[in-house]
Amino acid sequence: LGAVHSMSHALGANQELRLHHGTLNGVILPTILRFNRDHVGDKYAKILRAMRKDISADLADEIEQLNKEIGLPNGLAAMGVTEEMIPDLVAHSMTDPSNATTPRLPSQEEWEKLFLEAM
């Protein structure tokens, strides 16, 4: 689950936006794939192989392309998320139980950057 779900849970808690959890996961996934890239061993190569992609491809780029093909929003901003929301989102994400399964636990500053990158 990891950081993708931590961010999705934080965003899903916003009752004004009423965002779909699965869509959030898809939109956020490329950002977290990049963040974790150097901490996952050969797992990305295995996923790329299962996707029938060259293992030297960038998995985050491949997921972004897939997201585009299936019509997902191109970022959190397209879903109504604003930069003003980030401090609350970070606070929620930092304490989410899904962090127990992340290969790389972000610091507060890294959480902020991750939300900005996912915008």
Show which residues each predicted segment covers:
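Active-site segments that bind and position negatively charged phosphate/pyrophosphate groups
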Residues: 1-62
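C-terminal charged capping/lid subdomain of soluble metabolic enzymes
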Residues: 44, 50-119
